């Protein structure tokens, strides 16, 4: 039926990508008109460890996902053409002239460090299993170059196992899925406050009586009344009241601009297919309640990659570099976002946040000084926020004195009992 329905074709494929021994048996059957043609098939050595980054091709080697899709034109090359003379059986008997030369595909050097990629994959998979979580992502960036050294997601897929493909697993959650970041956004609220010139790390904020009223109603509260605390302690203790008071004291346009400069609500320009820009609403639409809730990570949304790039700004002494999935020959030009003074003040504050007095102490690493911030957010659902569905986040960098790596960990809907960012995401870091 396939042959008779395509009479204009010289041949039709009966089956492709057969194992050689199966093809040999088909030829041995001696059926007239049956022939074989050798084809090449992509093999991905890293398998599911790098599946979301590398992606895969279809049976004709056309990129369908990941770098295979984004750089298909680069990898593919061009088929040449020549004018020939054929006999009545269609066989080439003479080459007449070359019409267009062929061009081989070019080499593409991904930025991934497979050692870090494997470790990130292993630790994320363990965290998802241990915490009975729905999904998760880890992104690791090179502070000096903006290169993506690791990007892993769970659940994942193996591009070599086509029979087991599940389309729901293809999505690179680290660049496509947006989420409300919870308290992991607080460092950027504090950075805006310091840049305004109205606050310093030692400035005192009164968080009494432990909750905050806006518009006549309580919108947030801390785990306990922290009283008068400095800005450093706001981050270390993750005070919602303190962060909200800082945000409310800043001009709306200034606060929006500050967050936008960090990359919130903007594409990272990674070039990865399906990347989301996140959400940062126009400040003209803000109300006091919304401005306050921004300070502890509600009312705006980010991707894991965006959040990692934002933390990289603080790690890089206040400059923002474009992220790259491709290896760069030399560090790209950087854009200054905050002053060196502000960035270094944040480094010290974030180091306090992972100290024994902070919420992120489980992110500490022996023999290394690390800095970072936890985040825990209720997930939105039908009718409002669900009180039993959480997102756990940790963003940080190391070593503090001269940061080399930035990492963001996101664990979606942990259901193993623990759900705070400090308990679920920080240990992965």
Model-assigned labels for residue ranges:
Residues 86-99, 112, 138, 142-183, ...:
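Beta-lactam-recognizing serine transpeptidase/beta-lactamase-like catalytic domain environment
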Residues 120, 234, 429:
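A helicase ATPase "motif cassette" and its flanking acidic/Ser/Thr-rich regulatory loops
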Residues 10-11, 93-136:
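Conserved, well-ordered alpha-helix/loop/beta-strand core segments that scaffold catalytic motifs
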Residues 2-105, 408-409:
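Small/polar-residue-rich segments within soluble enzyme cores
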Residues 79, 132-135, 206:
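Short, small/polar residue-rich loop motifs at catalytic or cofactor-binding pockets
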